[in-house]
Swiss-Prot record:
This is Chaperone protein DnaK. GO terms for molecular function: ATP binding; ATP-dependent protein folding chaperone; unfolded protein binding. It comes from Azoarcus sp. (strain BH72). Keywords: ATP-binding, Chaperone, Nucleotide-binding, Phosphoprotein, Stress response. The modification Phosphothreonine is found at residue 199. The gene is dnaK. Residues 604-616 have a biased composition (Low complexity).
Amino acid sequence: MGKIIGIDLGTTNSCVSVMEGGKPKVIENSEGARTTPSVVAYAEDGEILVGAPAKRQAVTNARNTLFAVKRLIGRRFEEKEVQKDIDLMPYTIAKADNGDAWVEVRGKKIAPPQVSAEVLRKMKKTAEDYLGEEVTEAVITVPAYFNDSQRQATKDAGRIAGLEVKRIINEPTAAALAFGMDKKPGDSKIAVYDLGGGTFDISIIEIADIDGEHQFEVLATNGDTFLGGEDFDQRIIDYIVTEFKKEQGVDLKNDVLALQRLKEAAEKAKIELSSGSQTEVNLPYITADATGPKHLAIKITRAKFESLVEDLIERSIEPCRIALKDAGVKVSDIDDVILVGGQTRMPKVIEKVKEFFGKEPRRDVNPDEAVAVGASIQGGVLQGEVKDVLLLDVTPLSLGIETLGGVMTKLIQKNTTIPTKASQVFSTADDNQSAVTIHVLQGEREMASGNKSLGQFNLSDIPPAPRGMPQIEVTFDIDANGILHVSAKDKATGKENKIKIQANSGLSDEEVERMVRDAAAHAEEDKKAHELVDARNQCDALIHSTKKALAEHGDKIGADDKAKIEAAMKDAEEAIKSGDKDSIEAKSQALAMASQKLGEAMYGQQQAEGGAQAAGAAGGSSKADDADVVDAEFTEVKDKK
């Protein structure tokens, strides 16, 4: 049986590790480096370059050199963040037939998972060269805040690369595995702050020692799928472009070649400013105009860089607050803070994390390699090579379906330990409804429109029945990879339909904010919308039951009473259309009052029938039975008052 390798598929860099002799080993690539740039280039002769060779030729082949493609996985072309990237990236981002954001190189459209597959293939080859045998299985990491379709796309990328993805695990969880394996026995709570090249995650994890077994339980996770080192680089690029325009009057944003050189220089400057207080960006012959060639030389101090990215660092703190709150722990309960991702080497980031958590972050974890190491440990667990380790991960966002009135009914709450399964019984909204559409959603908002749509499917051939009668059981099943399977079953017929949510689009930055951060801010708005839906549904149900009762027992009341009920029903129907909650509730109350006589008539008939049956059975006096009937009617009327 071959080895299961662990791969950290990063936005900027990737890394591969394997268990050897019970210990994780990070494998050097063919260039001798322990990490590989997540860069893929398509040469003119059809050759595909991956890693350092691709990065080296980027300046001369900017339009066909792809980087940071992980940020496009599962995203729609129309999304604001994708549109922003279109202006920033030297390569072409194109719209796929299904509306997804793809890339275009040499006149051919390519899906992001295909590009990621090239990087995975390089990681696979790196491991095979080291092990001297074929590798077919892997554990691949993803940002904890990746949604279902993004996880599915990552799994697809593995399949394209010729790998069977045995498990998808969250990057902070993998880092916790790498950190916690060699720690002394005993319980501890850790915070993993993961600021990588393109994404940010924070996870609160409890490491417990239970009968000699290491148990890693994720208590809560949060993050931002569009915040990372690439954004820090971009701030430097924007600053240089602005300064150069002031000095030379030339806008470098229109020059693809210049932008590619600037990107390399910005990344280098950022790294240098982590250890030095000042750096110089010097790019001779950066561009030319009618007056001749232009040279770029600009000094950037650490203080200036920090001021440029201050808001980006601040953006990472709010998810930390939410994660602590969701985990039910205080800052003082955190024993260790682990920093993961190359961007955490920036002194200002370390300072901000220290300020928030009130303690110095650990320095004994390699931020570039910890995630891959954790992935290989999980591979060892799956293979049986690593024993006494239990990993309990969570789903980052709530999952549910759209129900009557556009409400999201949650079946699985965020931060639920996976794998997990949940079922709930729903019914039809109309009489003789023969099919239901199950609309699957992911997010935290009360109303369906505020959440991410993951897909929908139909359950048809439901036998004709009054509304509310059919029983449709909807089951959500999240596997250990965090990937969702949904089924709907008609309990009467046993007919069932299933769906594995397919990757159709990702979560935009705006969508994530709407789902998680803004959930609290919009709580009042959501509550009002929910109350309106409840009022509508209750009023609608009352109209339906009154219509039915009037059809069956209308002959037992006077014409005036019947007219009053019909008028009240019409008013209630108009109120539902108005969308005014107070009006709906008032008209519902009026309809209930108008229907009182009808209710009394129905009740009186039932009591009379019941009394007659009792009299026949007992053979007693009719007077006594009549008295019983009168008493019962009197009691009911008294209650209604």
